[in-house]
C-alpha cells in the first residue's frame, strides 16, 4: 500500500513490450480498485507507449453492443491493457470469455491486484484465475498484506504464480497439515469438526515465499508526502439505483418548476441523493430506512489491509456513524471503536481518550461537524471518508485531525465514491477547495443533479 506496486508493474510491462516479449497486460482487481489503474497508466506509461497502447476498461453497466465492441478489440494489433474487476469473473460469463480471448490473442502478463481476492480456492473467480494462469507468459500478484487472516491464505495466491512453488502439497489440506495446528471441537448439534487453532513452521513458509516475492515496507519509503489521496469506486446496489433515479427525476422536476432556483434549493435535493448513496432514506416524518449498499463492504476491505493500526472514519450523517460502529464492533469485537458526533456529547470525550490510549480501540468514527476541529488523532495513519460534507472547511479541518507537529509518518486518505452520482461532483468541488454552496449557482443545477 503506497509503495509503488502499480508503477512497478507498468514499468515492467513497458520494458517487456519493448523487447517484444509481452503485448497484453491483464489487470484483475477489486471493484473499488481496478479503475485507478487507468489513472495510473496515463500517469506512469512512457509517452511513446502511451501513444500506442489501447486501454480497455470493463464496465458491468455496458450493454450488449458495447460489450461486443470491446470483445473485438483483443484481435486487433498493438499493445493493450485490459482492466477487469474480480467480482465480474465470479458471475459474468462474458467477462470470463473476454479475458480468455484477450490472453489468447497475444503474449500476456496477468496481474492480480489485492491478490487476497483469490485466497479462497472454492470461489469461481479463483478457479478462473488458476485456469487462466498457465496461458499467461508472465504472472504477478500484488498485495499490501497477502495473509490478512491466516498464513494459509497464501496457498492459492502462489499457486496462481507457479504451481511448482508449493508442488510438494497436493492440495490445501496437505498445506494446512504442514503449517497449521488444528484441534477437534464438538458443535451444538453434536458434530465433531476440525478447526485451526494456531500455526507452525512459519519461518520455513516465509523462506519459501521470499524466493518468489519482493517486499517493500512503508517505513522504508522515506520520500512519501505528508498526505496521500486515493479513491475507492463503489457501485450502487440495484435498490440504490432505483431510489437514486427516482429522487433525481423528482429533484429535476421540482427545481424545473420553480421560478427562481437558489443554491440552497439545489443543496437540499443533493443531500437527499447523498443519503441514498450512503445507504438510507429519510421520510418527511424523519423515519430513516436502510437500503442495501456496498460502501460498508469496501470500507472493511480497506481496513482488512490495515491490521493492528488505527484509522479515522468520517461520515456526514449521524445514522451512518451508528451503522459503521455496529459493523466494526461485529467484525473486530466490542470496544474496537470510539465515536465523536452529536449523539454522544456526554461520552465523546471519554471515547476520544480510549482512542488515544487504548491499543484495542482502533477506529474513531466521527462527523466533520462535531469532530472536525481542534482534535488531535495523529495515532491514525489512515483516514476514510465514508461520505463527504458539502462544506470545504469541514473537509480541510477534518483532514488535519490525523496530522501533528513532528509526525514522521505519511497519512493515507481514502474517499469512497459511488460512480455516476453526486459524490463525484462533490469530491471534485472539494479538491478545488470549494464548498458546494459556492460552486453551485441556481441556473446550473442540472449539471449537479446527476
Locations of regions flagged by a protein language model:
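Conserved Walker A/P-loop ATP-binding site and its immediately adjacent core
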Residues: 6-8, 21-43, 148-153, 316-318
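SF2 helicase motor core recognition
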Residues: 91-92, 149-151, 321-325, 349-352, ...
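A conserved SF2-helicase RecA2
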Residues: 390-450
Amino acid at each position: 500500500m503506497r509503495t509503488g506496486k502499480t508503477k512497478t508493474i507498468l514499468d515492467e510491462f513497458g520494458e517487456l513490450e519493448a523487447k517484444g516479449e509481452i503485448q497484453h497486460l491483464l489487470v484483475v482487481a477489486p471493484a473499488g480498485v481496478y479503475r485507478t489503474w487507468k489513472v495510473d497508466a496515463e500517469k506512469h506509461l512512457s509517452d511513446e507507449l502511451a501513444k500506442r497502447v489501447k486501454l480497455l476498461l470493463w464496465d458491468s453497466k455496458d450493454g450488449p453492443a458495447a460489450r461486443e465492441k470491446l470483445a473485438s478489440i483483443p484481435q486487433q494489433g498493438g499493445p493493450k491493457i485490459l482492466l477487469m474487476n474480480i467480482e465480474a469473473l465470479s458471475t459474468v460469463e462474458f467477462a470470463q470469455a473476454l479475458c480468455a480471448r484477450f490472453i489468447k490473442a497475444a503474449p500476456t502478463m496477468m496481474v492480480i491486484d489485492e491478490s487476497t481476492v483469490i485466497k479462497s480456492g472454492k470461489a469461481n473467480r479463483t478457479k478462473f484465475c488458476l485456469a487462466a494462469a498457465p496461458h499467461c507468459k508472465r504472472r504477478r500478484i500484488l498485495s499490501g498484506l497477502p495473509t490478512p487472516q491466516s498464513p494459509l491464505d497464501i496457498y492459492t495466491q502462489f499457486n496462481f504464480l507457479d504451481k511448482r512453488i508449493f508442488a510438494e502439497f497436493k492440495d490445501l489440506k496437505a498445506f494446512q497439515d504442514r503449517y497449521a495446528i488444528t484441534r477437534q471441537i464438538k458443535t451444538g448439534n453434536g458434530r465433531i469438526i476440525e478447526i485451526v487453532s494456531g500455526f507452525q513452521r512459519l519461518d520455513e513458509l516465509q523462506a519459501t515465499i521470499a524466493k518468489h516475492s519482493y517486499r517493500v515496507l512503508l517505513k522504508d519509503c522515506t520520500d512519501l508526502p505528508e498526505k496521500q489521496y486515493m479513491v475507492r469506486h463503489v457501485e450502487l446496489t440495484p435498490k440504490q439505483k432505483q431510489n437514486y433515479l427516482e429522487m433525481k427525476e423528482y429533484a429535476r422536476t421540482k427545481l424545473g418548476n420553480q421560478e427562481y432556483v437558489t443554491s440552497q434549493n439545489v443543496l437540499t435535493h443533493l443531500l437527499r441523493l447523498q443519503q441514498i448513496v450512503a445507504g438510507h432514506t429519510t421520510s418527511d416524518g424523519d423515519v430513516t430506512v436502510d437500503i442495501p449498499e456496498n460502501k460498508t463492504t469496501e470500507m472493511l476491505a480497506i481496513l482488512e489491509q490495515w491490521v493492528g493500526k488505527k484509522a479515522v472514519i468520517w461520515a456526514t450523517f449521524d445514522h451512518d456513524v451508528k451503522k459503521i460502529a455496529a459493523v466494526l464492533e461485529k467484525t473486530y469485537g466490542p470496544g474496537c471503536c470510539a465515536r465523536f458526533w452529536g449523539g454522544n456529547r456526554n461520552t465523546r470525550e471519554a471515547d476520544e481518550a480510549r482512542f488515544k490510549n487504548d491499543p484495542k480501540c482502533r477506529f474513531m468514527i466521527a462527523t466533520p461537524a462535531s469532530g472536525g476541529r481542534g482534535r488531535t488523532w495523529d495515532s491514525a495513519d489512515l483516514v476514510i471518508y465514508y461520505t463527504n460534507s458539502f462544506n470545504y472547511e469541514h473537509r480541510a479541518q477534518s483532514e488535519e485531525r490525523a496530522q501533528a507537529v513532528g509526525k514522521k509518518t505519511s497519512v493515507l486518505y481514502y474517499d469512497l465514491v459511488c460512480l455516476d452520482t453526486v459524490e463525484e461532483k462533490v469530491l471534485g468541488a472539494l479538491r478545488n477547495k470549494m464548498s458546494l454552496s459556492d460552486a453551485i449557482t441556481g441556473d446550473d443545477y442540472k449539471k449537479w443533479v446527476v
